[in-house]
Amino acid sequence: MVHKIIFSHLFVFISFLSFSSVNNESRFSIITIGPYEDELYSAFGHSGIRYYNKSTGEDVFYNYGIFDFDQPNFYLNFLNGKLLYKVGKYSYPSAERFYRNQDRYIKEQILNLNPPDQILLYNYLEQNIKPENANYLYNYVYDNCATKIRDILEEVIGDKLSYAKYDEVISFRKLMDKYLDNNMWGDLGIDICLGPEIDSNIPYESKMFLPDYLFESLQSAKIGDTVDLVSETNEYIPSQNKSYKNIFSPNLIFFLLFIVVLFISFRQIKYDISFHKFDFLIFLLTGSVGLLLSYLWLFTDHLSTSNFNLFWAFPLNLIFSFLLITNFSRRLLNFYFILYS
């Protein structure tokens, strides 16, 4: 046991010697990148870690938000909630150029870390980017690019790290809604597919799944009682913030659908005729959505359990949609319609 303790201290000491020559010229920063409306996966922003060493010129970006469309079974893994993300390291100037070209704001928080904590953070990140350690199982709110950074800082700094507490009471869904004003179809997909788990009020630390909330939390964080975690903040704000809304919004489409249903219902009542093809489409659509929700609930790791949307998107509608256009028993169909309504 004594030998292990001596070895551990010796390892830290050697690491310190190897790092001390550049320690005064190096720094770690948390980088927060603004939302990008063109893609749903970028709509909430992004977080990463920058390491800059002035004496050697090394300037790199540790990115926990990398995924590969070419990975085996990508779409099946995505559907099952088992998508692998990974951490990678590449040039920070290249990363900054990329995000600037997308007209996204960039905020840098330089961390006020002492030499031993810098060594721990550096070694942690370098171990993480090794191929055998780089992959992790992504989760929308529990394990993403922002929560990874929160967890790493807490592991490196330990109990000395504390956050200022805010009284805002809010759920995951309401936090997401703040970012989806211009991505209404994405908002609709989240509202339909994710269940009531994301409607519960969450503790303050859980809000850091969003990069902006991580930024806000780190701004007021302390090491011990008096030392600010962030020593300096730099910001790049784009000259113009592109913002647009898709005119073909869910509200417009559902309003038009309501007008069509109203028109068809009026003609059915007035002329005593049936529109089985239209009923077929409605039941086919709601049944297909219900089948997807049932699959997400029963067979995946998504936040989709106990989804009350199954009350209107009923999977059996899929079967009865085809019975509508056959000579199947009208009595049974009418009974199902009454039961469904």
Question: Model features per residue range: what roles?
Answer:
Residues 15-17:
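N-terminal signal peptide c-region/cleavage motif recognized by signal peptidases
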Residues 21-25, 233:
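Membrane-proximal intrinsically disordered regions of secretory-pathway and membrane-system proteins
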Residues 68-143, 147-157:
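A cross-kingdom signal targeting lumenal/periplasmic-facing segments of multi-pass membrane
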